[in-house]
């Protein structure tokens, strides 16, 4: 690391012997690290952005058909949908689309927590689901690589550590 004020950079294509000391120092002293050499391609990021821009540029009436519901807390979030808990506060001014890790409706965790269940995928743009799932897979590959490195730093059994991350939200 060149300075205590800079965020260290690791390249996941480097050897573990090269990465581990930099990663450990970054996470213990700064709490952040920049990562390159990961599995999320620039093309995939660009495609994901294009798909999202195409979705959010659709007319409001079309997006509202995908709106989240009390029964399925996934889908389109219109401007002002959420408000702070304080009375009279300004409603949040963002729109979004809530997706989570895909969980089968009959998975027992769905009865315990409303945040688990199947996603509601919009019909347009047609490739949004495929692109999103490819993006998630690339992010998952990167996170698994980082978690393995962190397990080595912590000197814990890698598979046992990774098992703690099997049920993402």
Protein language model regions, located:
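Peripheral, non-catalytic segments flanking oxidoreductase cores
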Residues: 1-169
């Amino acid at each position: 690391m060149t300075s205590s004020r800079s965020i260290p950079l690791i390249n996941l294509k480097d050897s573990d012997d090269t990465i581990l000391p930099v990663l450990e120092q970054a996470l213990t002293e700064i709490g952040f690290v920049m990562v390159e050499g990961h599995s999320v391609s620039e093309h995939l990021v660009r495609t994901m952005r294009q798909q999202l821009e195409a979705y959010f540029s659709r007319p409001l009436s079309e997006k509202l058909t995908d709106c989240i519901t009390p029964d399925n807390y996934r889908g389109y979030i219109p401007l002002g949908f959420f408000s702070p808990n304080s009375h009279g506060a300004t409603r949040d001014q963002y729109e979004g689309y809530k997706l989570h890790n895909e969980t089968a409706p009959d998975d027992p965790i769905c009865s315990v927590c409303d945040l688990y269940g199947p996603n509601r995928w919009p019909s347009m743009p047609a490739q949004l689901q495929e692109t999103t799932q490819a993006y998630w897979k690339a992010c998952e590959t990167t996170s698994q690589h980082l978690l393995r490195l962190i397990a080595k730093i912590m000197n814990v059994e890698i598979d046992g550590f990774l098992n703690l991350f099997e049920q993402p939200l």
